[in-house]
Amino acid sequence: MSRYTGPVEKLERRLGVDLFMKGERRLAGKSALLKRPYAPGQHGQRRAKVSEYGSQLREKQKAKFMYGLSEKQFRRLFKEAARREGNTGEILVQLLEQRLDNLVYRMGFATTRRFARQLVTHGHILVDGKRVDIPSYSVKVGQKIEIAEKSKNNPQILRAVELTAQTGIVAWVDVEKDKKFGIFTRKPERDEIVIPIEERFIVELYSK
């Protein structure tokens, strides 16, 4: 299954949760989910009871769509999490958070992960001084992420920095917004990562 590219606000309404996919509209309080907090369609306001499998599938979809992964990418990441020692669900979330596109977003250089992914693929991002154009690149603790010199005055990036100043920066990165760079200082603890996902359902789904 390929990465979802359809209307993101309709998707958020269908899943009934904010997936942080509409940055500027969300920050302005204009997201469709806030105005119409129910599924689209004629019977959208009557949500059917969800089965156990439905709950498991729903959590996987939320994680995939929020972080912008295809089914193949997500399954590969889950296998990597399951291979490591520790809580598989928590490790999965940490691996998602270590993706380069996600950290560009977390550092406030993009209002959405989708825009962050575009910045990476179009060559606007450097890691330790070298251009990296792979959104799934797993950033290591201590690595420096910065906007390429030619892109530092990009209007969209400047707008993102201005808007994300309202929301603050997560505790596991250290950012110099004026200089357009940040350091991934440590792996986050699960209780620090504020996302509407119950990863235990994902573990149950893939463990069948």
Curated annotation (Swiss-Prot):
<protein>
    <recommendedName>
        <fullName>Small ribosomal subunit protein uS4</fullName>
    </recommendedName>
</protein>
<dbReference type="InterPro" id="IPR018079">
    <property type="entry name" value="Ribosomal_uS4_CS"/>
</dbReference>
<comment type="function">
    <text>One of the primary rRNA binding proteins, it binds directly to 16S rRNA where it nucleates assembly of the body of the 30S subunit.</text>
</comment>
<dbReference type="InterPro" id="IPR001912">
    <property type="entry name" value="Ribosomal_uS4_N"/>
</dbReference>
<keyword id="KW-0699">rRNA-binding</keyword>
<dbReference type="Pfam" id="PF00163">
    <property type="entry name" value="Ribosomal_S4"/>
</dbReference>
<dbReference type="GO" id="GO:0006412">
    <property type="term" value="P:translation"/>
</dbReference>
<comment type="subunit">
    <text>Part of the 30S ribosomal subunit. Contacts protein S5. The interaction surface between S4 and S5 is involved in control of translational fidelity.</text>
</comment>
<keyword id="KW-0689">Ribosomal protein</keyword>
<feature type="domain" description="S4 RNA-binding">
    <location>
        <begin position="98"/>
        <end position="161"/>
    </location>
</feature>
<dbReference type="InterPro" id="IPR005709">
    <property type="entry name" value="Ribosomal_uS4_bac-type"/>
</dbReference>
<dbReference type="GO" id="GO:0015935">
    <property type="term" value="C:small ribosomal subunit"/>
</dbReference>
<keyword id="KW-0694">RNA-binding</keyword>
<dbReference type="InterPro" id="IPR022801">
    <property type="entry name" value="Ribosomal_uS4"/>
</dbReference>
<dbReference type="Pfam" id="PF01479">
    <property type="entry name" value="S4"/>
</dbReference>
<comment type="function">
    <text>With S5 and S12 plays an important role in translational accuracy.</text>
</comment>
<dbReference type="InterPro" id="IPR002942">
    <property type="entry name" value="S4_RNA-bd"/>
</dbReference>
<dbReference type="GO" id="GO:0019843">
    <property type="term" value="F:rRNA binding"/>
</dbReference>
<comment type="similarity">
    <text>Belongs to the universal ribosomal protein uS4 family.</text>
</comment>
<dbReference type="GO" id="GO:0042274">
    <property type="term" value="P:ribosomal small subunit biogenesis"/>
</dbReference>
<dbReference type="InterPro" id="IPR036986">
    <property type="entry name" value="S4_RNA-bd_sf"/>
</dbReference>
<keyword id="KW-0687">Ribonucleoprotein</keyword>
<dbReference type="GO" id="GO:0003735">
    <property type="term" value="F:structural constituent of ribosome"/>
</dbReference>
